[in-house]
């Protein structure tokens, strides 16, 4: 259960915890327990949209196919993939979720072993088995299906839903392109790139890695060889480049996924004041997050 927060950009949801059982005394009776009920807040973190125009003559000359196909193509190749990629990347970045060892999984046997490890972790964390969804790359999931063994069938049966995910939607972080800046005019998203900030160190720290920047290219410099007179030009990596995800297990009740506003409409050419063109508009405003007391409901395995 969630409700509007103190401002329009957030929602709040209840979180409750109780103390456990104590010894019962035949004279004084029950041990007094406590109930802690609090409201937690989370802000909307996704606000994206696009406007496509198709000239009336272009549409006519394609037998009225161009306009309809443009809308369908937007949803199939841009909206749906970005929504998936944003969801997985956001969940992968949540602090406190369970993670396997970073490695490349190349065989069905290795995948089976990693899934058993993930299942053990979630079982020991007392995550309910019902409602667990397995998302994995198509290669891994299909390899496990083709394995067709007792063990592979048993592990797959442990998940309520099994869904293959294209690798292009399966990263630990993504960059949402703004559609305006140089190099981002096409919009959409890309695999998350490393992020850098100017160092705050006033002197080199031995063993620490700094970076110099030239035309957007960052070159590492070991702290032992960094120049104290050049500290103002050094950067530090604050976010590493995204990793490819092997698989993710999501206990559905653990996540908050809410689309507050979705609009998809058409403005005909005769209502367009700027051009003789039909317009398709699409906007989505929502959030993806995890309940603070249910982070164990997310298990992540990614490549090194």
Feature roles, as predicted:
Residues 26-28, 126, 170-176:
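Glycine-centered small-residue hotspots that permit tight backbone geometry or close packing
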């Amino acid at each position: 259960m969630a409700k509007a927060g103190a401002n329009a950009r957030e929602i709040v949801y209840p979180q409750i915890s109780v103390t456990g059982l104590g010894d019962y005394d035949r004279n004084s009776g029950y041990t007094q327990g406590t109930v802690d009920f609090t409201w937690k807040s989370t802000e909307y973190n996704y606000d994206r949209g696009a406007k496509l125009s198709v000239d009336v003559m272009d549409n006519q000359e394609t037998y009225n196919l161009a306009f309809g196909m443009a809308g369908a193509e937007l949803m199939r190749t841009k909206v749906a993939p970005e929504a998936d990629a944003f969801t997985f990347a956001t969940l992968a970045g949540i602090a406190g979720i369970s993670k396997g060892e970073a490695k490349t999984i190349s065989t069905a046997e290795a995948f089976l072993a990693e899934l058993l490890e993930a299942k053990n972790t979630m079982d020991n964390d007392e995550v309910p088995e019902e409602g667990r969804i397995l998302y994995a790359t198509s290669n891994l999931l299909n390899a496990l299906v083709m394995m067709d063994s007792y063990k592979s069938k048993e592990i797959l049966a442990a998940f309520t839903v099994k869904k293959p995910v294209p690798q292009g939607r399966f990263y630990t972080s993504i960059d949402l392109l703004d559609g305006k800046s140089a190099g981002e005019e096409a919009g959409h998203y890309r695999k998350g790139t490393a992020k850098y900030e100017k160092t705050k160190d006033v002197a080199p720290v031995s063993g620490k890695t700094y970076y110099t920047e030239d035309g957007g290219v960052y070159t590492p410099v070991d702290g032992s060889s960094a120049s104290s007179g050049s500290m103002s030009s050094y950067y530090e990596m604050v976010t590493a480049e995204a990793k490819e995800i092997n698989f993710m297990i999501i206990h559905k009740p653990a996540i908050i996924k809410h689309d507050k506003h979705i609009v998809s409409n058409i403005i005909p050419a005769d209502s367009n004041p700027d051009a003789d063109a039909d317009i398709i508009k699409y906007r989505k405003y929502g959030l993806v997050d995890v309940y603070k007391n249910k982070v164990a409901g997310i298990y992540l395995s990614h490549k090194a």
